[in-house]
Amino acid sequence: MSETGAKRRMDRFDPSIEPKWREFWAREGIFKAGRRAGAPRRYILEMFPYPSGDLHIGHLKNYVIGDALTRYYVIRGYDVLHPFGWDAFGLPAENAAIKYGRHPREWTYSNIAESKKSLEIAGIMYDWSREVTTCNPDYYRWNQWLFLLLYRKGLAYRAKATVNWDPVDQTVLANEQVDAEGRSWRSGAKVEKRELEQWFFRITAYAERLLNDLDKLDRWPENVKTMQRNWIGRSEGAEVTFLALPPGADLYAPPPPDAEPLVVFTTRPDTLWGATFMVLAPEHPLAPKLTAPERRAEVEAYIARARMESEIERTSATREKSGVFLGSYAINPVNDERIPIWIADYVLMGYGTGAIMAVPAHDQRDFEFARQFGLPVRVVVQPPGETLDGDTMTEAWPGDGVMVNSGPINGIPVGKGEGQSVKAAIAWLEAQGKGKGTVTYRLRDWLISRQRYWGTPIPMLHLPDGTIKPVPEDQLPVLLPEVQDYLPKGKSPLAAAEHWVNTIDPETGQPARRDTDTMDTFVDSSWYFLRFCDAQNDREIFSREAARQWMPVDQYIGGVEHAILHLLYARFITKVLYDEGLVPEDEPFKALFTQGMVQRRVRTPLDIVAPGMVRFPEELRRKLELPAEAQTVDQARALLKERGYTLEEESDGGLTAVSGPVTMSKSAGNGIPVGPFVRQYGSDVARIVVLFAAPPENSMEWTDEGVAGAQRFLNRIVALFGPDRDEIAAMVRSGNGAAPEGEDRALYRKLHETIRKVTLDTEQFRFNTAIAALMELLNEASRYRAEVGRVTPVFAQTAATFARLLSPFAPHLAEEVHSWCGGTGSVYDAGWPEWDESALVLDEVEIVLQVNGKLRGKIMAPAGADEEQLREWALTNPRVLSFVGDKTVRKVIVVPGKLVNVVV
């Protein structure tokens, strides 16, 4: 067979070409940062993962998006930093290790090796020389350094607090790690409340900056910024100090010396004169002291119940109000009235001060509570044109009006502006020394202590006299010791490692005990992007020069689920480091892209027990609460339909229950391992499916049809350009740059339209439409090649340019086509094509013909036709003439290049 004949049989994409190109990229360092000295820089980063072992296709989307963008900027001549690492400490690794009976370290490093293999076979190219693993001492040493920095600045502190306790994982959780239903972010267990000594980072000191600087992030999704604004939760109002009298105090006598100040934050200080009782959160530290002896049993039982409830349950608007009177009273500072003090679960310790002054006439929750327990309702705002009566009101009035029964602010209109009630009340409180205007936040300090083994040891020493001091910096890292028993027991497993816990204070030589808690894994991820700038530095966390060179991250890519966890913490730590002069800007990520998920239907075969009779498998029965008894096929179909499933018949006669699209995961059983898929189909096929199926911010469904479509596209590229590769290469080398004429003109125009569209779409993350444009160009090139019957300069130019345009999306085939076109070296050194604006000018344009503004026909006309020519063609057009008839033409409106409207 002749060589030409052999080449003509090249009609499909062969995935076996991929390994040689991956080896080539690694050998040549194509994607190593610093390769192009002096070139403009880009830092592109995907959120690093927990090492969970062999990756499935669902994991790939995040990385494929980042890789496509990286390849685009590399071929454009940028010096790109695209690093990778492993978020290896924390509960996910430890729980999995416990489940499989392996040490967390062994499990973690084994999974890192497997995951890395999957990424490499998928053709995701990183600068592996900057790889970080957070459980390595050379990384967590700097976690400890960061802790000591915050400690010196007064931003790390230890305090007793009511904390979220996960009874399954046996550890505390930050507020951000408890979902809206009061469940743990990892175990799903109902979170309990406990009083414990814990370490905190004072993120609230940065609350105002974290809030205001969201306005600078104009390339972040609005929904992420809104979530952070709501979580920070800024409120303006006043702090007012009530005086809580001890139980049994004489209500008519002056307050005794042991009366307790009770600080309240309110956004409506103008309604203080309407307060008829006070409510404390069940966790309030003064609640036990203010409880009368005869009420103690009831109060303690109520507090115990409240600790078991989630915040969303406690604050539900539809829930019947509950509470207990403590048996003590407080003095309202604006009128010296004695009002009863209650505890109720609708007041949260985590917001404001954990105490409220209740104004039932003007707050619906307080109103419902007052009606439930027969407490007085006093009106202090009268709405326009109405007269409210506290005894007959059926709901609170929270709206506008005029202040009444309010002493010095009577008659003032309600509002927060100048001359309105809120500012007037604050001015009066400050003048009287009874309160002050203030701002408060929903945001609470970041609780970083964890009572688990697999984490960064906290570098603090506990001395015999009860004091706590930091480990000197030159003693870092405090190494995580090897222990035999790392199962959770409610206190850190490190506490049992006596050989490690008992140490010597290096500064005094006195005995000391190490802190036995470990750090929240979100500390590890709060600064890892900075370590990538200088990952091999063993003298400092990173150099200022490296940070100036690369920071901030130009494009960050990851899931929206991290909006109020990782992303908020990373912004906080970056601001702290900026204040220390270590980083050039106080925001870590210029642009954020949140990708959608990869979904796939779950298919579960049913057991056929007799002709026309089936039984649901046990796992499906449990999951969907289906009957155990055998069902007819129609009964089974109906039961599945009620649960959002369909029943499909297989080619072998079997029956399968098919779910709707479900996020791909190991637990759902619908993951496709990366390795076997890539070996069979090629990573370029996987990449095209992921990038083409839907806009990347949306979730996409992985289907067999999508895989087949991606294969067809790549096969057509091979079939079109492969057989002619020698002729194409020769013509590209000859460099015929003459402007195309005649039949070549349409392909040349389509080529430059495609360059423009792929360029703009790639920069806007519209990968699906960029690939669609390449498919259109392929169609046009195929039509042209069939009609012309030979390789021409414009066809050769199209092939060479196509390889470069394809390179972000199907990089292995792009390199192959580039080599067919005579390219030496990598396609990523060939440069991104520029479009020719003059090529986009059409020879002919479509002109719409109208009569009295209604469409009556269309004609093709030369692009430069003047008004007179267009007018003449319109007035002689048979379709136009048939609608004009014998009517007089009053005027002709011509819009060159677009339309002619004949008015009769």
Swiss-Prot record:
Key word S-adenosyl-L-methionine present: no
Top EC group: ligase
CDD domains: Anticodon_Ia_Leu_BEm, LeuRS_core
A Pfam match: Anticodon_1
Binding, ATP: 666
Catalysed reactions, semicolon-separated: tRNA(Leu) + L-leucine + ATP = L-leucyl-tRNA(Leu) + AMP + diphosphate
Gene Ontology annotations of biological process type: leucyl-tRNA aminoacylation
Domain of life according to the entry: Bacteria
Keywords annotated in UniProt: Aminoacyl-tRNA synthetase, ATP-binding, Cytoplasm, Ligase, Nucleotide-binding, Protein biosynthesis
GO cellular component: cytosol
GO terms of molecular function: aminoacyl-tRNA deacylase activity; ATP binding; leucine-tRNA ligase activity
Motif 'HIGH' region: where in chain: 49-59
Intrachain disulfide bonds: none
EC number(s) recorded for this UniProt protein: 6.1.1.4
Motif ('KMSKS' region): 663-667
Compartments reported by the entry: Cytoplasm
PANTHER family, alphabetized: LEUCINE--TRNA LIGASE, MITOCHONDRIAL, LEUCYL-TRNA SYNTHETASE
Family statement drawn from the similarity comment of this UniProt entry: Belongs to the class-I aminoacyl-tRNA synthetase family.
Protein name: Leucine--tRNA ligase
Gene field: leuS
